[in-house]
Amino acid sequence: MKKMFILFVFCGLLSCKEKKNESFTAQQIVDKAIGISGGDLFVDCKLSFDFRDKHYISEGIGNNAVLKRVFDLEGKKVEDIKSKSKFERYVDGTLEVLQDTVANNYDNSVNSVHYFVKLPYGLNDPAVNKTLLKEVNLKGKEYYKIKVTFDQKGGGEDFEDTYFYWINKESFKTDYLAYDFHVDGGGVRFRKAYNERYIKGIRFVDYENYQPKDSTSTIENIDAKFELGDLELLSKIELKNISVQK
């Protein structure tokens, strides 16, 4: 009996050690992160929410998605509609004629808000390239650090931007993200997720949005800068009145 007990304890310790040393690819980590955030529940659902002074609506996923933004402008109702093939703006129900550059700016603005709200779901899009980097410790917790770049084909207007995601090793939840951008002089942003809530099985978070205090910060070392307190809070990204309909 004593030998059996010792064998049982040994097997248990071995199992824990193997689990602790279990390794995953970038794809496997992202798949788990998407799964814990709602997975296929994103498909074919109608999602609406308020962000700042605008109302957003999305129906469908991927190439079949229709993304909307509705807001008041000087007493007039503005409705922006982005689909796979076009972008349209209606003002009080009348279609506006827009220059291509203006339409592209509006299109990107609508897409960006919807994209961040649904993260990490979009990380399995065909144009996304994922690389697993060295694991890091942030605020006492261990994280997988994943670098994301985009192919020019299918990567959108901002395909040259680079993203980093910090996915918790225990929960597989995306707690931090960062990205660089090249418009308006360029820069780097670092976001910390908070106020997690699940609505009909889908995970939603708000973000604290940070920027570097000096020019020595890059997207590669932004996590170390955050750990040292060398970032400053720029804004908060808060979602309100979230609704999920199947």
Feature-to-residue mapping (PLM):
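Short, hydrophobic/aromatic-rich segments at coil-to-beta transitions
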Residues: 42-48, 63-69, 140-147, 174-176, ...
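Flexible, processing/modification-adjacent segments and terminal tails
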Residues: 21-25, 90-157, 181-184, 238, ...
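Mid-chain, structured segments of secreted extracytoplasmic proteins
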Residues: 68-103
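Gly/Pro-enriched, hydrophobic low-complexity segments
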Residues: 144-242
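Sec-dependent N-terminal signal peptides
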Residues: 4-13
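N-terminal leader/targeting segments and the immediate start of mature chains
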Residues: 15-53
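Extended lipid/amphipathic-ligand handling interfaces
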Residues: 33, 58-62, 194-196
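Positively charged n-region of N-terminal signal peptides that target proteins for export
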Residues: 1-4, 18
